[in-house]
Amino acid sequence: FSSRLNMNLREDKHWAYGAYSFTSGALGQRPWMAFAPVQIDKTAESLRELDREIRQYASGQVPPSGEEVARIQATEIRSLPGAYETGRAVMGTVGGMVRYDRPDDYVFERKARIEALDVDQVKRAAATIDPDKLVWVVVGDLKQTEAAVRALDLGEVRIVDADGQPVTSPASM
């Protein structure tokens, strides 16, 4: 709730109910995603803010603070018991250990690994994000958002229908 993205778009600007980013578990390259369901009339402005925040963070211009890292550590540590509250949660934890070839004592080491995370490690991880290679996905009323989103010049704009099929004539939507 206290992430930079959420504080900016929800708390400061009041354009979103919530905004956050996360990595998804995967073998090899892991996708990193940011979500921000926003007011439709603030779509372009919100994209501009997301782009600015991401660029400043990744470049080190506005690096992670010790307070931010400590807050994330505390949140992660408090969530650890939830991995064992139900049979399904235990299976998910064990499945992740197998999938990612984690050691048998992974669950016992996890807290210590989280506590050992430091600001420099987070800075190095942030530096691996290349804002110029991001794929931006905008969902909403094309008539209300297209011109302003195109004006941001975040890259090639591709329009797809609800089934993910390319749309050749946006006027027909």
Language-model segments: residues:
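M16 family metallopeptidases and their MPP-like homologs
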Residues: N6-V119, A127-V139, A171-M173
